[in-house]
Regions:
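Conserved C-terminal structural/oligomerization subdomain of aldehyde/semialdehyde dehydrogenase
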Residues: 1-119
C-alpha cells in the first residue's frame, strides 16, 4: 500500500483495515519512517503493548497525532527527523552547548583536586 509507505504531512487521515493488533503493528513498523502513531483502545494491556512494540518517536494512546506535546521530547525514529528530540527537557541538549568554566581569584598555585598527597 503506497499510503503506508510515505511520510505524509498535512490534513490527511489514512484508515487501513487490519485483522489483528499484531497485523496493525507489522503495518505500522513496516515503513521506513517513525515520527508518531496513535492507537485507540479500551484495553490497557493492548495500550502497553503498543507503547512497547510501535517503532515511533511518540505514541499517542486514545489521542490523535495532531502535533507534538511541547513538554515531551519530540522527534522520530528510523528515517524520520534529524536524530534529535526537539521539545521538552531534551531540547536543551539539542539547542545548547555545555561549557565549563573554572575561575580562581586567589593568586596562589592550586594543587589538583585529585591530588591527595599530604604536604
Amino acid at each position: 500500500m503506497r499510503i503506508a509507505q510515505e511520510e505524509i504531512f498535512g490534513p490527511t487521515t489514512s484508515l487501513l483495515r487490519v485483522t489483528s493488533f499484531e497485523e496493525a503493528v507489522r503495518v505500522a513498523n513496516g515503513i521506513e519512517y517513525g515520527l508518531s502513531c496513535a492507537i485507540f483502545t479500551r484495553d490497557v494491556n493492548q495500550a502497553f503493548r503498543a507503547m512497547r512494540d510501535l517503532q515511533t518517536g511518540i505514541t499517542y494512546i486514545n489521542a490523535g497525532t495532531t502535533g507534538a506535546e511541547v513538554h515531551l521530547p519530540f522527534g522520530g525514529t528510523k528515517a524520520t527527523g534529524n536524530g534529535h528530540r526537539e521539545a521538552g527537557q531534551a531540547a536543551l541538549d539539542v539547542f545548547t552547548e555545555w561549557k565549563s568554566i573554572y575561575v580562581d581569584y586567589s593568586g596562589k598555585l592550586q594543587r589538583a583536586q585529585i591530588d591527595n598527597v599530604e604536604s
